[in-house]
Amino acid sequence: MNFRELVLKNRSTRAFDPERRISREELEQLVDLARLTPSAVNLQPLKYLLSWQEETNALILAHTAWAGLLKDISLPPEGKGPAGYIVICIDTRIAKNAATDVGIAAQTILLGAAEKGLSGCMIGAIDPKLHDLLGLKEQYRISLIVALGRGAEDIRLVETRGNDTAYYREGDAHYVPKRPLEEILINGGAK
């Protein structure tokens, strides 16, 4: 699989195959990839909590919100939650803000997952209570959660209609509008 194929395979997945479990070792391999990525001023302020056990997975699921634009449905569907999570935290003793590092780490984790035949979803809508429920020390601030598992939904990329970038569902398909290249290049596209 070339890099473009890997990027295209990496979609925000909100329904997972319940038959495919994920191991701590698989999660560690993904975090190890993130560990090797660049970090601003090489501070490396990110710390990770791994969840692969059903009880912790259920706790995380109950304290996150998914697909905020889809008001009429609850995701993930009952029985199709992720097999595991990687909770990305910032160690505030090292840095107060590490948004760029978090983005680089999350994308690296998701690309590594795609290479393994897994899918994922970055979750930023997190109940603040989750910090204490997970037993995290005060110095760790949850920045983003990456849900992981084998995807069980039909996700299709389409071009935007006008300026509408809102994702939507039709039947069992999840549509993700993407702006055309010419629209995002400030200095014009190739002629």
Give the residues covered by each predicted segment:
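Acidic, surface-exposed loops and disordered segments
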Residues: 1-191
